[in-house]
Amino acid sequence: MKKIELLAPAGDINKLKTAVEYGADAVYLGGESFGLRKASKNFSMEDIKWATDYLHERGKKIHVTLNIIPHNDDMEGVEEYIKELYEIGVDALIVADPGMFMKVKEVAPDFPIHISTQGSVTNVETVKFWQKLGAERVGMARELRLKEVADIIKEVGDTIEVETFAHGAMCMSYSGRCLLSNYMTGRDANMGDCAQPCRYKYNLVEEKRPGEYFPIEEHEEGTFIMNSKDLCMIEHIDEMIEAGIASLKIEGRVKSEYYLATVIRSYRMAIDAYYADPENYKYDPSLLEEIKKVSHRDFTTGFFYGQANEDSQVYEDNSYIRGYDFVGIVLDYDEETKIATIEQRNRVFVGEEIEIFGPGIKHFDYKIEKMLDDKDREIDVANKAKQIFKIKIEEPIKKGFILRRENEE
């Protein structure tokens, strides 16, 4: 049985390293053009070259987004861009638009192409269509039931790979093809600049009574009528693998290293546990509890088990649940002195109790008894952005381990 791929996002080089350290098999990222995430830092061509070498040295793959829905003017420079990515050795391009697909085929005929979920693929005939044109993989629309995905895979066999989203934010528009942002703010979601108006709060107003709000709200601040819960399929890894899915995709190129480390680690552990003993695999509830320790909305299984309904939305507000704070990330650990060098992410004091975790292991508790700055002077608090501080940790850790603290607010 070919092992399912865990595909993770990377908004910058540090996040890419985190994704690899915590178990991603492949990483998807955007360049400075033609992608759908303007909010992430994205990668220069030099960065993509470095990332490709870094990933290939570790047996991982790199997929680059080319998934805008372009107008004529937006195609300027795309041929040279494709050529550069091909020469660098990028493993695949993620494409949504048929014109962009044909342009890739024209410039680099053997460049592997993955069809983005923005392509709105919902049936087996469309999968066959893309396969005949030469696509290597199709990312299925999020509106499909898991049984539909399994049936499609059964019919197309190994002629083309099928990818689905497994975790992350959900768009209320069909496969992400939203015009609300463009209409309301002038920011085009199909060009990577979504303002997320689906998360705004709304009230009903009658046109002849401006300023008079009708009392239909679930919350005193308004009605959140399009505010989807986040997708989370950690409880159903076995069913997704057994459906024949080739790749599970995690959303979140603008998320933090802490978010990526936590989510990727949990899915990696679930996937590995399944393949270690498929017949006796049992879902581990602690993995979901770990995922709940990062910033998130309430969770849903989306459309995988039927039509999304009122339980798939958050009506009360548009805020995230933040049960834990990201304290810092380990830059170095001296095994002789047991001194860990940490880069701070949130203010932390001597005397606080924190949790520490790393790739493939359960977290452990730790109380900060003493803290030094980067010049080995004793301090009581690390309160400057990305401040370097040192603490002694007897339990062996490594570079890339994460420190977090329960948020009591």
Cite the ranges covered by each PLM segment:
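Surface-exposed amphipathic alpha-helical tracts and adjacent flexible/coil segments at the periphery
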Residues: 1-22, 26-29, 33, 52, ...
